[in-house]
A protein has these predicted regions:
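Negatively charged, low-complexity tracts enriched in Asp/Glu with abundant Ser/Thr
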Residues: 1-12
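Generic preference for hydrophobic/aromatic residues in regular secondary structure cores
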Residues: 4, 43-50, 73, 77
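Generic structural motif recognizing short loop/turn segments at the entrances and edges of beta-strands
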Residues: 8-10, 31-33, 41-43, 74, ...
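Short linear sequence elements within intrinsically disordered, low-complexity coil regions
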Residues: 10-12, 17-20, 40, 79, ...
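Extended aliphatic helical segments
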Residues: 11, 24-26, 38, 45, ...
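A short, structured beta-strand/loop element
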Residues: 16, 20-61
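C-terminal structural segments of small proteins and small subunits
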Residues: 64-96
Length: 100
């Protein structure tokens, strides 16, 4: 379960046993949301948010912040997803300290 980003209390991560579509799990304060990144010709078309079946959902304000983060950093998330799931590379977590 590699952590890919930390952002003001949010943890962005992948579960290592998952598959397409490209998505990222976001956790904060014991809550979680999952953001699917929909691309067309390498460009962002849509971000689809869904809730976990096992963990309570992020509160709406946190979900909106997490979605804004995913929108801003989607290329980095996709690169890390491809490196981890396709190329089986080890990925490093990045701590973001500048508010978006």
């Amino acid at each position: 379960m590699p952590k890919i980003f930390e952002y003001f209390g949010f943890i962005f991560l992948f579960y290592s046993n998952e598959h397409e579509p490209i998505h990222v799990h976001v956790m904060k304060d014991g809550h979680e949301a999952i953001f699917e990144i929909i691309l067309e010709n390498g460009e962002l078309v849509e971000i689809h948010r869904r809730n976990s079946n096992k963990i309570p959902p992020l509160i709406e304000e946190d979900a909106a912040t997490a979605e804004a983060f995913v929108k801003k950093y989607y290329k980095n998330i996709v690169d890390k997803w491809v490196n981890f799931f396709i190329y089986k590379k080890r990925i490093r977590s990045t701590k973001i300290t500048k508010k978006i």
